[in-house]
Amino acid sequence: MNIAALLSGGVDSSVVVHLLCEQGYKPTLFYIKIGMDGAEYMDCSAEEDIEMSTAIARKYGLSLEVVDLHKEYWENVAAYAIDKIKKGLTPNPDVMCNKLIKFGCFEQQVGKNFDFTATGHYATTIRQDGKTWLGTAKDPVKDQTDFLAQIDYLQVSKLMFPIGGLMKQEVREIASRAGLPSARRKDSQGICFLGKINYNDFVRRFLGEREGAIIELETGKKVGTHRGYWFHTIGQRKGLGLSGGPWFVIKKDVEENIIYVSHGYGVETQFGSEFRINDFHFITENPWKDAGKEIDITFKIRHTPEFTKGKLVQEEGGQFRILSSEKLQGIAPGQFGVIYDEEAGICVGSGEITR
């Protein structure tokens, strides 16, 4: 079996290589380079990642190729993120990176020559009724199916997730026993292409700054100023620079550059129990096409270990609405609502939250 393995320089993808070699495979290793654009944003993390990936390749006597998808990334994923932010929405570039770059452009240029592509994502694949489904990982804290929820059937059918059945601690123990150079390396955080670059610096580069008012939702009183609505997301608590907190961002007026906040975590205006999903995407197929209008599901509206129980309502015209079993804080339009089966074992698909 001919396998392409994607390396990031981290412990997870390194253990993937170790496990594949243990099973008798000799995968071809690839590092996808996307990175920030511009000398003022130069960051050493990509160089460190490539050095670590090279060390793994050398340890197992495998070839490593650096695939430069910088142009494709910026024309697709970064442009998508900036467009959503400018509209006052909350994008998820990591979701689009997986769909369009790692399993899109890479597949078209390189992956098509291999039987499977193996990655260090915490996810699984499940064969059911003759079809491949995206399954959740053993480790609920590290599960990354919400970041994979926009891939299609052809993509999920070619993917291997060798560490999906392991807990994170088990992965680190394997790396330590195998003497992998990445065994003690910290997990990466934040958006995939930013490295150590500050998110606000990235946004400021493209959208600049424009002072606007921060207004208390209940009273209409101005309580502060901000540097641009695009620096803030629905549900945000930190970084507002207001005294007498806690304060939460409740909504944004994009036209007037106003941010509305509410005082105190338990304020009813912060919460909602339903939202709509635009352009819902089924990864494999719609498993409920013959069911009634309301289906019992679990779902996520942000990257957390917890699944929320609810109902998926299929409306006329192919639209979908989610009814949550509990109040939700910070429903952010632009983010992805990710839908799972009732047991939270299969990730069925996702769509953009429109509220």
From Swiss-Prot:
The active site is at C97 (nucleophile), C192 (cysteine persulfide intermediate). The keyword Transferase applies. InterPro entries: MnmA-like (IPR004506), MnmA-like_C (IPR046885), MnmA-like_central (IPR046884), MnmA-like_central_sf (IPR023382), Rossmann-like_a/b/a_fold (IPR014729), tRNA_2-thiouridylase_MnmA (IPR051305). It is found in: Cytoplasm. ATP binds at L6, L7, S8, G9, G10, V11, D12, S13, G120. Keywords: ATP-binding, Cytoplasm, Disulfide bond, Nucleotide-binding, RNA-binding, Transferase, tRNA processing, tRNA-binding. Disulfide bonds join C97-C192. Gene3D superfamilies: Adenine nucleotide alpha hydrolases-like domains, HUPs, Translation factors. It catalyses: S-sulfanyl-L-cysteinyl-[protein] + uridine(34) in tRNA + AH2 + ATP = 2-thiouridine(34) in tRNA + L-cysteinyl-[protein] + A + AMP + diphosphate + H(+). Pfam families: tRNA_Me_trans (PF03054), tRNA_Me_trans_C (PF20258), tRNA_Me_trans_M (PF20259). One of its GO terms (biological process) is tRNA modification. Residues 92-94 are annotated as: Interaction with target base in tRNA. The record marks H121, Q335 as: Interaction with tRNA. GO terms for cellular component: cytoplasm. CDD domains: MnmA_TRMU-like. Signal peptide: none annotated. GO terms for molecular function: ATP binding; tRNA binding; tRNA-uridine 2-sulfurtransferase activity. It comes from the Bacteria. It is an enzyme of class 2 (transferase). SUPFAM superfamilies: Adenine nucleotide alpha hydrolases-like. Its EC number is 2.8.1.13. Transmembrane segments: none annotated. Belongs to the MnmA/TRMU family. NCBIfam families: PRK00143.1, trmU. Catalyzes the 2-thiolation of uridine at the wobble position (U34) of tRNA, leading to the formation of s(2)U34. This is tRNA-specific 2-thiouridylase MnmA 1. It comes from Bacteroides thetaiotaomicron (strain ATCC 29148 / DSM 2079 / JCM 5827 / CCUG 10774 / NCTC 10582 / VPI-5482 / E50). The gene is mnmA1.
